[in-house]
Each structure stands twice: as structure tokens, then as C-alpha cells.
């Protein structure tokens, strides 16, 4: 059920009948204020300008031609030519009844696309830290949302599993005569990494040996490949524990690291040269892009192969985009990578398109995001100024949530309390991020994110349990609610109308990669239910018809909250 699409089609038909061109836009939006109706069509203004007509005159003609049947109770013209549409409460009740019994909240079937979603992308031989959080959870929310709508989603975890660091690690492991890397945990690898880097910086012979190992690794040396694979496997096994804990849907099968594209790189460089896109410049192979200028106003050079024959991230990203089209069959590729990488990605994609590796129809989208900041407005760090490990952050979240729950429910069984602390603590961290516009930086604040008031996970989880409990207390099964939904109270109508707008919200989230829009909708929905709950008797309604209708509204609210939170990867709970 998408009311906005329905009304847009109807208003567009009326505009065309009134003389507007066939490609006119109705510009139907949800009204900002109740006095302007439920929806407002603003397209008359721009169409009137094209037709050379006074906007209000065109609006009057459109309203005369507008056939909304029983959808609207009133249509009126406001201001210079805005069309305000007031929905018919009986029609709203009928649609809510239908949505309640339909699968997937009656979301319209989509024309299925293959959507590749690039997210998380931690580095091998390093523990995940807070810098990986936003990509991981925003990308996962996108994957869940697209799948719910019916698209084929391919998750791509573009892990950093190649490069100079592996030469250092292999050389250091050999130096320590410890080739049994499978016995190491990731914390050991972090220490190894630091020691290897120290040797690399301070010992010229060691650095030379490390560089030699990189060349051997790139050349397919079996010993180096075996050691490299151990390092990758240890890291990804540890990362999988973090993904599971975060309720993130990534698995080891989704790993598509930088190394996947190695075999493609020589051919791509040769092909770009053959097409005249890449040239030799000071020993390196460079693509000069007119679309980007350097500080002297000249075309910017993008290096795709260094003097020593090594490749760069850009080369890998060119291969990556090509692979995602040719091998994965992508129609759309979403990159959840921070905003600092924007120019780099744009340059790689410009080269990809110039080379003809992908068609114009393939949408490459950088869904960039800002940084997570501390209360001081600086990048979130430990008290000593170090990087915060993701595992430590989640431990603290669960611990803080556990203490809050224990204060409110001291008699709760320990096992249930731990399970609830996990759901609330992890949910709080995720929701605090997802509820902010991804394009901006946000302040990480424990007190705000764990509050039981406001747009937070604990509040939303509590709201769900409250709604679900109404239905449980009624002691009836959904199949027993056989009477039609009838609404007489304003709060019932407002809640039902907002419930019917779920499809508008989720399609916006899917199109723009904006999970905060879903969070805002769910928070608004929870607030509307709270008002309905407080002012409308449900279980003690004055008639069986009203009782069943209000139970249906409660059930539809619970279903909608659960589906919405599921698309965000936020766990719902039965008791708070």
C-alpha cells in the first residue's frame, strides 16, 4: 500500500487531462500540517508556468477532473495553487484491514534487481575498531531493506587482505620462527603487526626482506600464500564473532577482498593503455582525467601502476566495478565507505565508464557517511587517545544496559537479564548510529543512547513490548478478529494513516540509503500509538466492534514496528 504513488498517479492523470504534458510531475507529498490535509500536490505551480496559466486556475481545473473515488473525503485548493487532499477515514480503515492480513504488510512487488552492497571492509591482521561500525551497520540495514523489498542482494565484504603489510607479517613470523599462525588469536596478530611495523621502520634489511615477500606473494609463492591464508582465516573467524554479536548478516561467504581482483589487474592496465586512456608518466602508468583538475588547473593524473610494477587501490576498484557487473550481474552497486574516499571512488568510476567496462544503466552509488565523534567533538578515542576496539565498545554497551535492567527488574532471572542486556546494549549502539543522518558526523553519548525516553533503541524496544502486550492481555488469536476495522476517534484515524505510510518510508530508505528515515518513522509511530493507547479504551472498549478494531490497530502497529526494526537489524524483545 503506497498512498503517495496512488495519489500521484491520480493527480498526474488529472493534470494531463487539463492540458499538461505527459511527463508532468504531480509532486504529491505528505502534508507537513494536518490543516493542509493528509497529502498535498504541489505540481500545479510548475506546470502552470509551462502552460502560461494562472496556477489557481489550473488547480481548479485539475480538482474538477480529479477522480479519487472513495479515497478522499475532501479536496481543496490552498494558496496560489496547492491541492490539499484529506483521506476518507472509511477508506483508511479498509486499507489498514487489508494490510494487516496481507503478507509483508502489503508491500507492492518490485521489479527485482541484483544489488551489490559493499560494506564493513575491515583489514586483515587487525581487530575491528569503532571506525568500522558505521559502514558495517548502515550497510547491513541497507542489505536487509533491499532483501525485504524483494531484490537479490549480494553482500560484498571488501576486506583489506593484500599489500605491503603481509610482507612485514610473514617476514616477522619467519624471524620469530613461528609459522604456526593458526594458534594465534587476533590480539596476538595485533602485537605481531606492531612489532613487524617497528622492524620495518627501523631495520633496513628486514624492510628489504618484507618487500621481497610482497613480490613473492604477488607472484604466487606457495609458502607465502599459505602464511597469508592463515592470517586471513584467523582474522575473518574473529570478525565473524563480532558480526554475529552485532546481529549483522555478513558471513565468511561474503568476503570479497582486494586479493580477489589480483589476476585482473595486469589485463586492465594493458587494456587502458591500448584504449589510449593510460599513458606512461615518470615511469608510472597514469590516467589523466579532464573531469578533475590539479592545483595548476591541469587534468589530474590518477596512477594505476607504480614504477616498481605495483598496483594501487584505484586499480583494484576499477577491477572491482568491472567484476561486479560482468561476473555478479549487478544492476546497482552501493558502496558504504566514509566520505573521505569520495574523490577516489569517483575517479575510479570515471575510468571504468570511459573504458566501457560497465553500461550507463549500472548505477554506482557512494552512500558516504560521516565520523563518530566523542563528546568533545573530536574523533571517538579511548581516554589514553587510542583507537577504541569494537569488542570493547560492545562489552561496555552490554554492561551498561545490564546495570540499567537490573535496577528496573532486580528479580529477573540471570539468563533472561543477560539476553535482554545483549539486545538492549547492542541495539542501543546500532540505533544511535542508524537514527542519525549518515552523511553527517554524530556525537557518541552513552547516556543518550541508553535512555528509555526519546528516539533510542531502549525506547523503541519498550514501545514494541508495550504494543505486543496489549494483544497478549486480550487473550485472543488474530484469526478471532473477524469484525471489520471501524474508526471514530481522531487518534485511531491518525495512527492508521501513519501505519499505511510504511511502504512510502521503506522505499525512500531503499532508494536513498537513509536508515534514519526509518528510525524517525518508527519513533513517530510509537508516539502515535502511545497517544492512542492512553486516550482510547482497547480491552474495555464500549462495543465488541470497537474492541476488535483497536486490537487490530495494536496488532498492525506491533507488526510494523517489528518489521521496521528488523530492517535496521535491531532485535525486539518480549519483556523489558
From Swiss-Prot:
This is Arginine--tRNA ligase. The keyword DNA damage does not apply. A motif ('HIGH' region) lies at residues 122-132. The keyword Protein biosynthesis applies. It is an enzyme of class 6 (ligase). CDD domains: Anticodon_Ia_Arg (cd07956), ArgRS_core (cd00671). One of its GO terms (cellular component) is cytoplasm. It comes from the Bacteria. Gene3D superfamilies: Arginyl tRNA synthetase N-terminal domain (3.30.1360.70), HUPs (3.40.50.620), Isoleucyl-tRNA Synthetase, Domain 1 (1.10.730.10). It is found in: Cytoplasm. It catalyses: tRNA(Arg) + L-arginine + ATP = L-arginyl-tRNA(Arg) + AMP + diphosphate. Keywords: Aminoacyl-tRNA synthetase, ATP-binding, Cytoplasm, Ligase, Nucleotide-binding, Protein biosynthesis. GO terms for biological process: arginyl-tRNA aminoacylation. NCBIfam families: argS (TIGR00456). One of its GO terms (molecular function) is ATP binding. HAMAP family: Arg_tRNA_synth (MF_00123). Monomer. The gene is argS. InterPro entries: aa-tRNA-synth_I_CS, Arg-tRNA-ligase, Arg-tRNA-synth_N, Arg-tRNA-synth_N_sf, ArgRS_core, DALR_anticod-bd, Rossmann-like_a/b/a_fold, tRNAsynth_Ia_anticodon-bd. It comes from Serratia proteamaculans (strain 568). Its EC number is 6.1.1.19. Belongs to the class-I aminoacyl-tRNA synthetase family.
Amino acid at each position: 500500500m503506497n498512498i503517495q504513488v496512488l495519489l500521484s498517479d491520480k493527480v498526474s492523470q488529472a493534470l494531463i487531462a487539463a492540458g499538461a504534458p505527459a511527463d508532468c510531475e504531480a509532486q504529491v507529498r505528505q502534508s507537513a500540517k494536518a490543516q493542509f490535509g493528509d497529502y498535498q500536490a504541489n505540481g500545479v505551480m510548475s506546470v502552470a508556468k509551462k502552460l502560461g496559466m494562472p496556477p489557481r486556475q489550473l488547480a481548479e481545473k485539475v480538482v474538477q477532473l480529479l477522480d479519487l473515488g472513495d479515497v478522499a473525503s475532501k479536496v481543496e485548493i490552498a494558496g496560489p495553487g496547492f491541492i490539499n487532499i484529506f483521506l476518507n477515514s472509511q477508506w483508511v480503515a479498509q486499507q489498514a484491514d487489508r494490510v494487516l492480513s496481507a503478507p509483508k504488510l502489503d508491500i507492492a512487488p518490485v521489479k527485482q534487481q541484483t544489488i551489490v552492497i559493499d560494506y564493513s571492509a575491515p583489514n586483515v591482521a587487525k581487530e575491528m575498531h569503532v571506525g568500522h561500525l558505521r559502514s558495517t551497520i548502515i550497510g547491513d540495514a541497507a542489505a536487509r531493506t533491499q532483501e525485504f523489498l524483494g531484490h537479490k542482494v549480494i553482500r560484498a565484504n571488501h576486506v583489506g587482505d593484500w599489500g605491503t603489510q603481509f610482507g612485514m607479517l610473514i617476514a616477522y613470523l619467519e624471524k620469530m620462527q613461528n609459522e604456526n599462525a593458526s594458534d594465534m588469536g587476533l590480539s596476538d596478530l595485533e602485537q605481531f603487526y606492531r612489532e613487524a611495523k617497528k622492524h620495518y621502520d627501523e631495520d633496513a634489511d628486514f624492510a628489504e626482506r618484507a618487500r621481497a615477500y610482497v613480490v613473492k606473494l604477488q607472484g604466487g609463492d606457495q609458502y607465502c600464500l599459505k602464511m597469508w591464508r592463515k592470517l586471513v582465516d584467523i582474522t575473518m573467524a574473529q570478525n565473524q564473532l563480532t558480526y554475529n554479536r552485532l546481529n549483522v548478516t555478513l558471513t565468511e561467504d561474503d568476503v570479497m577482498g582486494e586479493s580477489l581482483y589480483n589476476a585482473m589487474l595486469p589485463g586492465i592496465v594493458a587494456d587502458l593503455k591500448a584504449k589510449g586512456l593510460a599513458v606512461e608518466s615518470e615511469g608510472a602508468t597514469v590516467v589523466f582525467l579532464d573531469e578533475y583538475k590539479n592545483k595548476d588547473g591541469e587534468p589530474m593524473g590518477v596512477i594505476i601502476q607504480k614504477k616498481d610494477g605495483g598496483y594501487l587501490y584505484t586499480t583494484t576498484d576499477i577491477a572491482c566495478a568491472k567484476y561486479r557487473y560482468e561476473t555478479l550481474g549487478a544492476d546497482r552497486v552501493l558502496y558504504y565507505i566514509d566520505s573521505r574516499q569520495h574523490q577516489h571512488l569517483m575517479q575510479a568510476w570515471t575510468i571504468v565508464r570511459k573504458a566501457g567496462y560497465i553500461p550507463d544503466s549500472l548505477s554506482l552509488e557512494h552512500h558516504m557517511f560521516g565520523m563518530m565523534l566523542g563528546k568533545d567533538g573530536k574523533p571517538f578515542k579511548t581516554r589514553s587517545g587510542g583507537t577504541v576496539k569494537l569488542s570493547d565498545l560492545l562489552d561496555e554497551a552490554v554492561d551498561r544496559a545490564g546495570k540499567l535492567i537490573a535496577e528496573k527488574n532486580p528479580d529477573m532471572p540471570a539468563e533472561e537479564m543477560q539476553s535482554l542486556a545483549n539486545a538492549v546494549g547492542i541495539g542501543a549502539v546500532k540505533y544511535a548510529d542508524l537514527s542519525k543522518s549518515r552523511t553527517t558526523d554524530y556525537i557518541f553519548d552513552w547516556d543518550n543512547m541508553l535512555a528509555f525516553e526519546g528516539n533510542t533503541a531502549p525506547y523503541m524496544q519498550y514501545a514494541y513490548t508495550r504494543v505486543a502486550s496489549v494483544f497478549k492481555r486480550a487473550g485472543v488469536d488474530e484469526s478471532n478478529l473477524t469484525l471489520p476495522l471501524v474508526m471514530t476517534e481522531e487518534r485511531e484515524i491518525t495512527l492508521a494513516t501513519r501505519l499505511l505510510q510504511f511502504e512510502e518510508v521503506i522505499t525512500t530508505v531503499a532508494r536513498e540509503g537513509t536508515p534514519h528515515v526509518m528510525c524517525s518513522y518508527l519513533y513517530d509511530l510509537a508516539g502515535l500509538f502511545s497517544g492512542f493507547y492512553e486516550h482510547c479504551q482497547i480491552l474495555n472498549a464500549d462495543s465488541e466492534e470497537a474492541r476488535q478494531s483497536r486490537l487490530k490497530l495494536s496488532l498492525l502497529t506491533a507488526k510494523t514496528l517489528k518489521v521496521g526494526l528488523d530492517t535496521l537489524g535491531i532485535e525486539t524483545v518480549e519483556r523489558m
